[in-house]
């Protein structure tokens, strides 16, 4: 039996330029699924990440099962691939964030749909398929996470296509309830995690000094986070990952994070408006932003901050002030995105009820297109402001100030900021073409 795992390409994905390609990190869904595949059936597995690979599928040959994992902005490509391989006689399985939130839609394209985590249901499906009784749908549960105790089969991936730091995930889900977040909807607001000893074993086997953690909210469960950071300390690795601003208020957890080897954090600040934070049920405190960043800097940690445009309280003036605010709080690398109402998230349901969803073309759900009607400007103006605020934030003067502001990672920060400046030009070009089509 042969299985092909595919992560589809989307319009704003990673195979775009030398810069975006250089930032590509290894996705773990396919290596995990391969590791979960029961060995007793003698199954041959192959994985394709369209974000970093160009493939001629006609030359691949036949696969008994084709498993496709998709986010919203890549799901249409996923459906195209499903149709292609179904025509060749393959059995199609689809899962991932979008499929979990829109299972009935996905069922129109796949023989089997999987929702939620696959730790238990993937093995169940393989056994059913081998016995010729596969179900149309399998629903995973958050409590399934970590029960399989497997090491991802990273050898299936083309490691040379990704950044030097291997990816690891320990925590899944998030207990916060941000209105716009697809993670919360996928995991139903629950926290799940692998056994700490399993993660440590995974890291040891990688034999790498640097690790990139993909955990969406690693400090959601404080007890787990403390134990995990303590277990990392003897490994003497350097790592980067995600974090929420509330880490500022937990001194013990923060100290353990630093001691465990943290050197870089991606943090979702989203907005400088307290009203917008309350609107989206985000727990950030604007008055703490600068103190949070300063605290990380004092401990040698660089901060990549993400910011979102399009909240109901946003105005043209408030958006265009963001570069100055960002410089004031000291973020090393800023990133902007348009508020995207992913299907069946709370913000999607609210905007849909208000009649404000303007596009259900999932290709547009890529964080650079406006798919809803903002309150204080048009969708086109919101897209234009994404370009304008990025241009202003990535002026050479601002980039240089960020690079030299503190002594840690200056050359890297300079390079990444310049890279995002170039990337923003590609975004502007993409949007410009779309505007021309609509004119």
Locate the predicted segments by residue.
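Residue-level recognition of beta-strand->loop/alpha-helix junctions
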Residues: 47-51, 69, 185, 217, ...
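Structural recognition of alpha->loop->beta junctions
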Residues: 104-124, 256-266, 321-336
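Radical SAM enzyme core and accessory elements
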Residues: 2-5, 17, 42-44, 62, ...
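Structural detector of well-ordered beta-strand residues that form the stable sheet scaffold
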Residues: 93-94, 114, 137-138, 240-242, ...
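Radical SAM [4Fe-4S] cluster-binding motif and immediate context
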Residues: 150-304, 311, 316, 321-324
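Flexible glycine/acidic-rich beta-alpha junction loops that bind and position SAM and/or redox cofactors
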Residues: 10-14, 105, 223, 275, ...
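Alpha-helical structural signal in soluble globular domains
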Residues: 36-40, 84, 88, 105, ...
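Acidic, low-complexity intrinsically disordered segments
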Residues: 1-210
